[in-house]
């Protein structure tokens, strides 16, 4: 299965589009620092997905890429939390982001756990 066909990729793509739309509405003092960091981090997550999916035969490397994904993903969730606390996004948008991030977390953790189990054998 190609990376772009993965359900987690579809959710990440949806999250990325939503974040780009929201960042575009940020006040100037947030758009070019916090907003840029959010976009850079969310785009970097795609790189980790592509890298992990490419390592079909090497479960150790796949696990490493998924760990890197989770590290950057944790950063993204903190950045999203800051936008919420600074009231840069609405409660509705915060709820939608929470649903997407939860879905993505479950999928990535499931993928990582599967890779870890194969690694342990």
How would you name each of these model-derived features?
Residues 1-121:
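Amphipathic alpha-helical assembly/interaction segments
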């Amino acid at each position: 299965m190609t990376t772009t066909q993965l359900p987690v990729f579809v959710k990440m793509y949806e999250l990325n589009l939503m974040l780009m739309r929201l960042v575009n509405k940020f006040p100037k003092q947030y758009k070019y620092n916090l907003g840029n960091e959010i976009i850079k981090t969310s785009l970097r997550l795609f790189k980790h997905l592509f890298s992990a999916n490419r390592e079909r035969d090497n479960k150790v490397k796949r696990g490493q890429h998924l760990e890197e994904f989770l590290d950057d993903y944790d950063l993204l969730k903190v950045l999203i939390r800051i936008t919420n606390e600074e009231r840069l996004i609405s409660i509705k948008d915060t709820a939608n982001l929470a649903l997407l991030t939860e879905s993505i977390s479950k999928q990535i953790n499931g993928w990582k756990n599967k890779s870890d189990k194969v690694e342990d054998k």
